[in-house]
């Protein structure tokens, strides 16, 4: 994958840490979105402080991010993921990759039907009680 042409979208960007990691890995076009104004401001500050150029959007994924991305990152808990997974599918390129994390053991069985409905699991990693998935569209 040529990272120069990849758009990476971080959903629920928070502090923007995943954008900083993506930039460190060589991804040039970075977008973070968060519904919380404070989080969006912090992400912008952290990107600026680390000399990372990123578009930060305070808003709703469905209406405020108009493009698609080849890589989408979402470190979110189960409740927002259950709502957002169908929207994320519309924002991910057909051959793109979605990486979700923030899924704790206690809620694993609850999220799996949402994942299995529209997504193919490429890889699952477990660290203690936490699960991370790399997914692609079915």
Annotate each predicted stretch with a short phrase.
Residues 29, 98-99:
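A short hydrophobic/small-residue beta-strand
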Residues 85-97:
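A short glycine-rich, Lys/Arg-flanked "PGG" loop and its adjoining helix->strand segment in the class I
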């Amino acid at each position: 994958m040529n990272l120069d042409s990849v758009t990476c979208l971080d959903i629920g960007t928070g502090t923007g840490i995943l954008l900083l990691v993506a930039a460190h890995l060589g991804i040039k076009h970075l977008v973070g979105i968060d519904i919380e104004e404070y989080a969006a401001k912090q992400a912008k500050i952290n990107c600026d402080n680390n000399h990372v150029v990123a578009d930060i959007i305070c808003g709703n994924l469905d209406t405020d991010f108009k493009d698609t991305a080849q890589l989408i990152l979402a470190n979110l808990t189960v409740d927002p993921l259950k709502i957002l997974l169908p929207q994320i599918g519309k924002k991910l390129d057909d051959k793109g990759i979605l990486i979700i994390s923030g899924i704790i053991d206690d809620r694993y069985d609850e999220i799996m039907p949402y994942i299995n409905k529209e997504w193919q699991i490429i890889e699952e990693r477990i660290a203690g009680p936490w699960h991370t998935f790399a997914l692609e569209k079915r």
